[in-house]
Amino acid sequence: MKFSYSFVQVVTLLLSLSPSVEGFTRSRNDACKPNHPFRPLPPSQPRTKTCHVVSNGHGKDDSKNIMKALHKCNNGGKVVFDANKVYTVGTALDMTFLKHIDLEVLGKIQFTNDTDYWQANSFKHGFQNATTFFQLGGEDVNVYGGGTLDGNGQVWYDLYAEDALILRPILFGVIGLKGGTIGPLKLRYSPQWYQLVANSSDVIFDGIDISGYSSSKNEAKNTDGWDTYRSDNIVIQNSVINNGDDCVSFKPNSTNILVQNLHCNGSHGISVGSLGQYKGEVDIVQNVLVYNISMYNASDGARIKVWPGVSSAMSEDLQGGGGLGSVKNVTYNQMYIENVDWAIEVTQCYGQKNLTLCNEYPSNLTISDIHFKNFRGTTSGKRDPNVGTIVCSSPNVCSDIYAENIDVKSPKGTDNFVCTNVDKSLLDVNCA
């Protein structure tokens, strides 16, 4: 049984992200291996015409040229961003009208660093102050080619250090897409999350290479690899992620999600949530399979994070608590960890440091039918002697949480778990 990438596997995966369309298939189901989507993905129709986007060069805005090519080749065509060319985007692009179209990105698309413009004009999505440079949506849309999208993030990292309330755009916004393939692509220096998948279904992300760190003392914060939100039947696979926040995060109303074959470094793990942030709103995450993950230098491996039933503040720009909903039928299977603080973390006290208050006002979200299987590796030692924590705010809101074949130890050889308000007989771990 394989738990992690070998060196050869990592090299092969990196090579698959080179500027080519090799591996792209219009039969999306054939691309999903070894596990298949929860529901068959619709095939993509052939394309019969090609449009090349003209680059103005010299940092001039190419947005009009991009939109012209998209309209011209919509409904059955392919739009090409040519190799060895840089396309500058200084205008928010609404591309939710797309239908039966491919975008082949061979060159580089770079977004301007005009922070005043983007704060005023980026697309606002409501949840957690999310904004995007563009909205890509419609029906049967494929984006591939191995080229680069560059968010010019450094100016945003420095600005956020001065003002935590600024609106930082997400690099890649998939909004309202019904049927699509994204990748291979390289994503670099996103101001905030790298990808938001909202109100979308039947989309596969395959061969995404994510990387981008700050060159100043100000960290690149909140740089999640993917955030799924109000989306169904999404596949994320065969990708390399070097970032500073969640490798993948399943935000509210994410259902039927498959994540497999990822190499995550420097992240906060693969996370359910956070959920329950908005009082009175119902958040559901259901039917999720996370399979064959390598997790390095992270705060968490597998993580479920839920806000308590009382108002809390994680940071100046992230506050909430009191929401409703459920987490159900989530499986993490085959995860290798190295230098990770918590191999497994389940918390219903996200954003609240006062544990007494958290227990007095337990979470309104239920967590049930959760499976952690076949973990191995070594933690960072930060939580010694503990390697994992499975803590519910009340025994009434957690049920059927299982852990089996967990072979994880701290650098000192300990393997303790914190287990609170859960059925310990279902946990094949050392509940200290």
UniProtKB/Swiss-Prot annotation:
GO terms for biological process: cell wall organization; pectin catabolic process. The active site is at D245, H268. PbH1 repeats lie at residues 231-252, 254-274, 285-306, 327-348, 362-394. Glycans are attached at N113, N129, N199, N253, N265, N292, N297, N329, N354, N364. Keywords: Cell wall biogenesis/degradation, Disulfide bond, Glycoprotein, Glycosidase, Hydrolase, Repeat, Secreted, Signal. It catalyses: [(1->4)-alpha-D-galacturonosyl](n) + H2O = alpha-D-galacturonate + [(1->4)-alpha-D-galacturonosyl](n-1). GO terms for cellular component: extracellular region. Residues 1-23 form the signal peptide. Its EC number is 3.2.1.67. It holds the Pfam family Glyco_hydro_28. InterPro entries: Glyco_hydro_28, PbH1, Pectin_lyas_fold, Pectin_lyase_fold/virulence. Its main location: secreted. One of its GO terms (molecular function) is polygalacturonase activity. Disulfide bonds join C247-C264, C392-C398. It is found in: Secreted. Specific in hydrolyzing the terminal glycosidic bond of polygalacturonic acid and oligogalacturonates. Belongs to the glycosyl hydrolase 28 family. This is Probable exopolygalacturonase X. It comes from Aspergillus fumigatus (strain ATCC MYA-4609 / CBS 101355 / FGSC A1100 / Af293) (Neosartorya fumigata). The gene is pgaX.
